[in-house]
């Protein structure tokens, strides 16, 4: 579906790029090519600007990071492709990604009409729905 184009997005530009992508999606216009969104959206994982040296232990650092990121980690595109190729789902099989984020796995599925996903991050869900409009993607509310 979308080509994997390796990106080196500087840490200090990720939040800005994410905001521009979300603005483009919200505008309802094709301001940014979908392939660019697929390759450039980073979510909140890695945006924390925390330094391990500022904490007394790795555990404190990891807990602070987890609180900020909500445990978010986007599986790299190549790994998603390899996993889907290994599983080799048919176009008739239903596939569920219970923590779909921006939907990286959906990019490699044979039939998006049989793809289901949910996530707790509304921004990531908005990106996934935009990129994979045929898939069934829901926002899971948490308290």
How should these model regions be labeled?
Residues 2-127:
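Class I S-adenosyl-L-methionine
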Residues 128-135:
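Short, conserved SAM-binding/catalytic segment
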């Amino acid at each position: 579906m979308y080509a994997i184009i390796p990106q080196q997005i500087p840490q200090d530009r990720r939040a800005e790029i994410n905001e521009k992508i979300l603005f483009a999606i919200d505008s309802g216009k094709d301001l940014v090519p979908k392939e660019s969104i697929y390759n450039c959206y980073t979510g909140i994982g890695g945006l924390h600007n925390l330094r391990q040296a500022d904490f007394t232990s790795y555990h404190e650092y990891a807990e602070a990071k987890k609180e900020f990121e909500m445990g978010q980690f986007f599986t790299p595109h190549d790994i998603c492709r390899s996993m889907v190729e290994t599983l080799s789902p048919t176009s008739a099989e239903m596939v569920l990604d219970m923590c779909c984020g921006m939907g990286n796995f959906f990019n490699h599925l044979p039939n998006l009409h049989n793809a289901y996903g949910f996530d707790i991050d509304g921004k990531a869900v908005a990106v996934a729905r935009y990129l994979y409009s045929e898939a069934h993607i829901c926002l899971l509310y948490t308290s």
